[in-house]
Amino acid sequence: MLFLKLIWLLVSIFLISIIYLRVPRNQGLTSFATKSDLLGSPNSTEKFLNNFTLILIISYYLIAVKLNQMSIIG
C-alpha cells in the first residue's frame, strides 16, 4: 500500500508540472517564435503530450479508487 501511495504521489506531482509547464495554444504570431522541436514536429509533440497526460490522469484516478477501496476494507 505504501508503494501505491508513492506512485500516486509521483503521478500527481508529474501531472501538476506537465499542466503548468505546457505552453498555451493559440497565442497568435508569437507562438511561432517560441515553439521548439525537442521531440520532433510540434504537432507530434503536442499529440504525445496530450496522450501522455490523458494516460496519467486515468492512472491517477484508478490508483485513487484502489487506495480508497483499500482504506475502506482494511
UniProtKB/Swiss-Prot annotation:
Pfam families: SecG. The keyword Lipid biosynthesis does not apply. Its main location: plastid. One of its GO terms (cellular component) is chloroplast thylakoid membrane. It is a multi-pass membrane protein. Keywords: Chloroplast, Membrane, Plastid, Protein transport, Thylakoid, Translocation, Transmembrane, Transmembrane helix, Transport. The keyword Thylakoid applies. It is found in: Plastid, Chloroplast thylakoid membrane. GO terms for molecular function: protein-transporting ATPase activity. The chain crosses the membrane at residues 1-21, 54-74. InterPro entries: SecG. GO terms for biological process: protein secretion. NCBIfam families: secG. Involved in protein export. Participates in an early event of protein translocation across the chloroplast thylakoid membrane (Potential). Belongs to the SecG family. This is Probable protein-export membrane protein secG. It comes from Trieres chinensis (Marine centric diatom). The gene is secG.
